[in-house]
């Protein structure tokens, strides 16, 4: 779904319709948050789903513990992907790389502390992933709001993001199907 952000934002950037880029990013965030809500139910009941497709009970139970710890990550991912595509469409990639490396290094430290030192195990591992993604969202958001590089493209939150959401949804759905088809065809 996020690949549509890069396409549409890239077109807006090329057409010098800079203010439209922020609206496109917000529209994508709204759709991604909707998808995250739907996926939350799958994560909550992953034990039953996994057992229904033949996974053993013990593995399904452990997978559910891990999946439930990843629920906050779903929402962070819903925010992060459109923001990253928004920045990439403007050729702002070095700050993204620096933020990602910084969060990765903190993630290593957090994982060691939470799993090895504090002993939180599987749930700790998934919650650490969620924490790291939220740190990345915060850094990306601060960069977008505070950086002079985004002054023309980010004009603040707007209700315009809800206008034209259905055509944008159709574009993102088509993009997701296309990417799934490409992935599936190469895995055969």
For the regions a protein language model found, what residue spans apply to each?
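Membrane-interface helix-loop junctions in multi-pass transport and translocation proteins
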Residues: 60-61, 94-138, 142-146
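Small-residue-rich hydrophobic transmembrane alpha-helices
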Residues: 1-40, 80-89, 96
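Helix-terminus/linker motif at the lipid-water interface of multi-pass membrane proteins
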Residues: 50-57, 113-120, 176, 180-188
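Alpha-helical transmembrane segments of multi-pass membrane proteins
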Residues: 22-35, 41-45, 57-83, 98, 105, 170-174, 178, ...
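Interhelical loop/hinge segments that connect adjacent transmembrane helices in multipass membrane
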Residues: 122, 126-132, 138-186
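Membrane-embedded alpha-helical segments of multi-pass transporters/permeases
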Residues: 37-44, 52, 69, 108, ...
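Hydrophobic alpha-helical transmembrane bundles that constitute the permease/transmembrane domains
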Residues: 1-4, 40-41, 74-82, 86-90, ...
